[in-house]
Amino acid sequence: MRRRRFRRRRAPIRRRRIRRRRTRLSRNIRGHRRSSRIYYFRLRRKDKITLTQATNDFKFGTGIFTFKLADVLTVGLNAPTLKVPFEDYQIALVKVEMRPLGVDITTWKGFGHTVPMYDARLKTFQGQVDLGDDPLMDFDGARKWDLRKGFKRLIRPRPQLTIADLATANQSAATWFSGRNQWIPLQVSGNSLFPQKVNHYGLAFSYLQPQPDPMYYECEVTFYVKFRQFAWTTLNVPPTPNIEGMELMHICNGDCNQCFADALDPDSAVDSE
């Protein structure tokens, strides 16, 4: 007797349910209702740097860069100070670029080093000249730069503040902000408070002092600043419409993957030359 062959029933095809992406924002983040909205601005400043000539043969000098918001709120000589209608700010990144003026690139001028320093020790290298050796060449993070070409360096500055609330009188200590807690309030009461002048450290550079004439450099410092909590009406004097020098880069709600402060690595994004 022949066996009957039964075909196995195939399991029904389960169709995956495709969920459509919501194009309408939730109620609490529409418009300006969310308080964590962050505004990114690019602010620039230019200066002339002079490297003084050496009094003796083969001497080194050093210089420093510190950064504060007040440096870029005035766009030129005798220009009005830019008023910023935000509650808090944070200097996320700074790019320093120095290029020589009127230098013959075919003649060797020597080289120096650039080193990021994030505390007040940076000021010990301010304006030193006639040094017997390069004091920055053995620092961790030092990069060589050619005096004929200049340098370009991107750093993540850090504000160092002084506190006087100690167990002993007439003494002070230093503290740093963390990356998450680095917001500095702009709108403060009192005429003696200047949050725009908080020093952010910093960059030190060394160089072989030129001979027989000094060398001149054009220096462009670019600030990448984050602001939060737009507050147009909280200023004592309403802001002027003069926004020259300010370039709005990006607005987000704080968790965006395109934010330069989270996606950019200061150690590898811009190499010194």
UniProtKB/Swiss-Prot annotation:
> Which terms in the GO cellular component ontology are assigned?
host cell; host cell nucleus; T=1 icosahedral viral capsid
The entry's keywords: Capsid protein, DNA-binding, Host nucleus, Host-virus interaction, T=1 icosahedral capsid protein, Viral attachment to host cell, Viral penetration into host cytoplasm, Viral penetration into host nucleus, Virion, Virus endocytosis by host, Virus entry into host cell
Instruction: Look up the record and give one Gene Ontology term from the biological process aspect.
Output: viral capsid assembly
Q: What is this protein called?
A: Probable capsid protein
According to its UniProt record, where is this protein located?
A: Host nucleus; Virion
Record-stated family = Belongs to the circoviridae capsid protein family.
- What's the gene? Cap
| Chain segments carrying region Nuclear localization signals | 7-35
| Assembly notes | Homomultimer. Assembles in the nucleus, presumably in an immature form, then migrates to the cytoplasm once assembled as mature virion. Interacts with Rep; this interaction relocates Rep into the nucleus.
Region (DNA-binding) residue ranges read 1-31
Functional summary from the UniProt entry? Self-assembles to form the virion icosahedral capsid with a T=1 symmetry. This very small capsid (17 - 22 nm in diameter) allows the virus to be very stable in the environment and resistant to some disinfectants, including detergents. Essential for the initial attachment to heparan sulfate moieties and chondroitin sulfate B of the host cell surface proteoglycans. After attachment, the virus is endocytosed and traffics to the nucleus. The capsid protein binds and transports the viral genome and Rep across the nuclear envelope.
Q: Which GO terms describe its molecular function?
A: DNA binding
